[in-house]
UniProtKB/Swiss-Prot annotation:
A GO-annotated cellular component: cytoplasm
Domain annotation Response regulatory: ranges: 5-122
Subcellular location field: Cytoplasm
GO MF, any single term: DNA-binding transcription factor activity
Cited Pfam families: Response_reg, Spo0A_C
Protein name, as recorded: Stage 0 sporulation protein A
Cofactor or coenzyme needed: Ca(2+)
Residue list for modification 4-aspartylphosphate: 56
Keyword match Cytoplasm: yes
Organism: Niallia circulans (Bacillus circulans)
Positions bound to Ca(2+): 10-11, 56
C-alpha cells in the first residue's frame, strides 16, 4: 500500500515532534520532512513533493499565507494543505482558501482528528474548508496570538504577503507594541534594529515599508 507522504511545518518544535511520532505510527502515512519556518517549508515542497502539508499560519520569516502564495507560483504539484491556527479570523481563513488551503484545524486539537483529515484531503482536490477544535492541548504563547492579530490586520489592509516590506512591517508593529517609545525614534532605533535582524540596511527597511 502506497503511504501518504506528509510534511509538517510549525515553529513549535515540541508539537512537530509529537505530530511526527503520531503520523509515522500510522500504517498508511509517513512524515517525509519537517520544517520550522516558511523558507524551509518551500524548500521541502521543491525537493520532496509531499501529498499533504500540515502548515501553521504564524511562523517566522515567511508566514503560512505567504507560503501558500509562493507555492502557487512554483513549477511543482501543489500539496493538499491543512492549516493549523490558534485563531479563527474569517478574513484570514477566506484568504487561505483562495490561495489553495484544503482544510483548517484550530489549536488545540486531537491528533486522531488530524490523521483522519490527512487521509481525507489526500484523495481530494483543494477548495473546501472546515474548522475544528478538539482535545489535543498545546498552549500557544501570547506572542503567537499577537502575531496572528498583526497578520490579520496587514492582510486586511491589502499588503501582499510576498513583498519584503510585509515582513519588515510585521516586525515593526510587533516591536512598537512591546515598546511604544520606539515611535519616537523610528529612523534612529526601529529601522536599524529591524535591519540588523534581517541582515540589511535601515534605509532599505524604510524604503520597503514605505
Amino acid at each position: 500500500m502506497k503511504k501518504i507522504k506528509v510534511c509538517i511545518v510549525d515553529d513549535n518544535r515540541e508539537l512537530v515532534g509529537l505530530l511526527e511520532e503520531y503520523i509515522d505510527a500510522q500504517d498508511d502515512m509517513e512524515v517525509i520532512g519537517v520544517a520550522h519556518n516558511g523558507q524551509e517549508c518551500l524548500e521541502l515542497v521543491e525537493q520532496l513533493e509531499p501529498d499533504v502539508m500540515v502548515l501553521d499560519i504564524i511562523m517566522p520569516h515567511i508566514d503560512g499565507l505567504a507560503v501558500l502564495e509562493r507555492m502557487r507560483q512554483m513549477n511543482k504539484p501543489m500539496p493538499n494543505v491543512i492549516m493549523l491556527t490558534a485563531f479563527g479570523q474569517e478574513d484570514v481563513t477566506k484568504k487561505a482558501v483562495e490561495l489553495g488551503a484544503s482544510y483548517f484545524i484550530l489549536k488545540p486539537f486531537d491528533m486522531e482528528y488530524l490523521a483522519s483529515h490527512i487521509r481525507q484531503v489526500s484523495g481530494k482536490t483543494t477548495g473546501f474548508v472546515r474548522k475544528s477544535s478538539s482535545s489535543f492541548k498545546t498552549q500557544e504563547p501570547k506572542t503567537k496570538n499577537l502575531d496572528a492579530s498583526i497578520t490579520s490586520i496587514i492582510h486586511e489592509i491589502g499588503v501582499p504577503a510576498h513583498i519584503k516590506g510585509y515582513l519588515y512591517l510585521r516586525e515593526a508593529i510587533s516591536m512598537v507594541y512591546n515598546d511604544i517609545e520606539l515611535l519616537g525614534s523610528i529612523t534612529k532605533v526601529l529601522y536599524p534594529d529591524i535591519a540588523k535582524k534581517y541582515n540589511t540596511t535601515a534605509s532599505r527597511v524604510e524604503r520597503a515599508i514605505r
